[in-house]
Design a protein with these regions (language model features):
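A residue-level signal for conserved active-site and pocket-lining positions in enzyme catalytic cores
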Residues: 11, 140, 257
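Alpha/propeptide regions of enzymes that mature by internal proteolysis
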Residues: 1-71, 143
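Anionic-ligand-binding alpha/beta catalytic cores of soluble enzymes and soluble regulatory domains
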Residues: 124-208
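Active-site histidine-anchored catalytic micro-motif
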Residues: 4, 29-34, 49, 61-70, ...
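Pepsin/retropepsin-fold aspartyl endopeptidases
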Residues: 264-282
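Short acidic, Gly/Ser-rich segments with clustered Asp/Glu that frequently serve as metal-coordination loops
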Residues: 12-16, 74-77, 259-261
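A conserved acidic, glycine/proline-rich C-terminal tail/linker
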Residues: 192-266
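Generic structural signal for buried aliphatic residues
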Residues: 67, 212-214, 243, 271-276
Length: 282
């Protein structure tokens, strides 16, 4: 099933013509495509972030939607170019470099095919080695979204189990304590989004208004430790105060009401940034 929707994501930014070129290639293949943008502000080369933003988004798009994600520091190398079919019958066109990690874990991938560049590479670009986003991914995505090719015509089938995956931090739950990673930021506002799911946090039996000891480490270095209130939303604490909350993806978040937690405490993201939440009794 194809629905003529094409959603683009990259680390290209919008300061030059790269994204516009991708759009042009897609519309040249099918002028009736409806093209939308997830984001083009992924931190350059940050595959983990690209993977997370797909996970943040795909569930809210209809069945049959085609996504093109280009965060490709290995462009021109031997890494594979693939199309993954999700459990919701959506398609993700991307390099097989870890971009599919969060989709595989949290959404589900039912099949994956390697893009045959003989059939699905834009003509006369075989000597272009640094812009697969235009010549392979946008082009193949447009063909798929428009129904000009089927998923089976993308190329040979690969094993879903062989998809390149990024390492993730497993949540640890102990008595009155839960540990996870700071996966990503709510970028504009500087809130921290952790890997700890709502269900995992609920093992601590929290009630709104409870206080928790929050500890953040970067590798083995202590970065932050303080007592923080758990609330429904930011207004449950005074302006400038920290708050624990469940975010829109049902993960535990840490924010400052009308402030940036990340900037205030110089906190980063990724598997080297870990967070511990301990319930304060009494």
């Amino acid at each position: 099933m194809n629905n003529n929707l094409l959603v683009l994501q990259s680390d290209f930014g919008l300061v030059d013509g790269a994204v516009s070129a991708m759009i042009g290639v897609a519309l040249e293949e099918s002028p009736t495509l409806k093209i939308h943008h997830l984001t083009h502000d992924i931190t350059p080369y940050n595959i983990f972030e690209g993977s997370y933003r797909l996970f943040q988004t795909v569930d809210y798009w209809p069945e049959g939607t085609t996504f093109v994600s280009v965060v490709d520091p290995g462009v021109g190398s031997k890494r594979k170019s693939v199309v993954a079919k999700t459990a919701k019958n959506q398609y993700i066109v991307t390099p097989d470099n870890g971009t599919l990690s969060f989709i595989k874990k949290h959404v589900g991938i039912v099949a994956i095919r390697e893009i045959s560049e003989v059939a699905n590479r834009r003509q006369n670009t075989e000597h272009s080695y640094t812009f697969n986003g235009r010549d392979v991914y946008a082009y193949t995505g447009a063909k798929l979204a428009s129904g000009h090719i089927t998923f089976e015509e993308v190329g040979p089938e690969l094993s879903v189990e062989q998809i390149v995956e990024l390492p993730v931090v497993a949540t640890i739950i102990e008595d009155h304590l839960v540990k996870g990673a700071i996966d990503i930021l709510d970028v504009r506002f500087g809130s921290l989004w952790t890997s700890i799911t709502r269900e995992e946090f609920y093992k601590l039996e929290p009630e709104f208004g409870d206080r928790f000891e929050v500890t953040i480490y970067h590798a083995d270095m202590l970065v932050y430790q303080n007592q923080v209130v758990y609330g429904k939303s930011f207004a449950d604490v005074r302006i400038g105060q920290p708050i624990l909350y469940i975010n829109s993806l049902y993960r535990l978040g840490l924010a400052i009401n009308q402030g940036s937690f990340a900037k205030a405490y110089n906190v980063g993201v990724g598997s080297s940034w870990t967070i511990e939440i301990k319930k304060i009794e009494g």
